[in-house]
């Protein structure tokens, strides 16, 4: 083996391995201290890009879950208020039925009307004050809003909240009154016993209701025939013996027309819009029609509550799906970017041992040129 002074190859080799061990030791310490095995693009350029995309998706999913939970909270708030609206309407219906009873005096009905008026005021107060985050929910100003329930654009769901005030057209319908009242002595006559009621339902389909009363039937029996033929309209008789027909906005679209011999004899007039806001139970006829008006309002409220229930269930399933996606995305990101501490600790120990060994060998290699001095003796 040649003895060289100018070039110490052994020392250079030991130095190279020492540098490599030091670099590996530094990398392991960085990974262990940060918790990430990819800390810069030089560690894994492709892995860094993939993990960043997964991180963006994961954060977007977290926001989407929060958005969906906000949507559920809004729906729950509105549905809770509508539950109380339902209770109020049911009480108003009870009072209408009570007032329609013949045992009540005028003073009794006036007292009942006072409670109906107070309940109407409370119904409107609920509609005007129910809010979430400063947004009014039930007074008609919320309209339709979108809820972003996905990590990317375009993944939105629409929520509509209707006006629950008592003067909303959907909280009632149209009332058709006969011009001619019929007393207890009136009865249906042969040749003039037919009545055709033509209307269009909310799906746009034309409907015709044909009534054939029997000779000798009175006005109350005629109303019973109408109610027995369809639930699209509700018929009753007021205090003056006038037939009144109510068509709820939740079932009938547009005007109702009357034809036939009975229509001419009764003198059915043009319809008047009526809502819960204007119900009057101070008369038997008004109380009876109030029942039909409140029934239409209850169906409208219940229908909207059902929609909110479906919305909440949909969002609950959406949240479960988002959580599942986020779990898998986070797991994938972790496999790519996160440090395997068991593996990295082993690598650190290895690099530390190699560093110590390289340092020892380098020290010995530096002593090799001293042999040249001994030869010069």
UniProtKB/Swiss-Prot annotation:
Domain of life: Bacteria
Compartment list: Secreted; Bacterial flagellum
Record GO cellular component, one term: bacterial-type flagellum
Cell membrane recorded as keyword: no
GO terms assigned for molecular function: structural molecule activity
Coiled-coil features, chain-numbered ranges: 104-128
Designated name of the protein: Flagellin D
Name of the coding gene: flaD
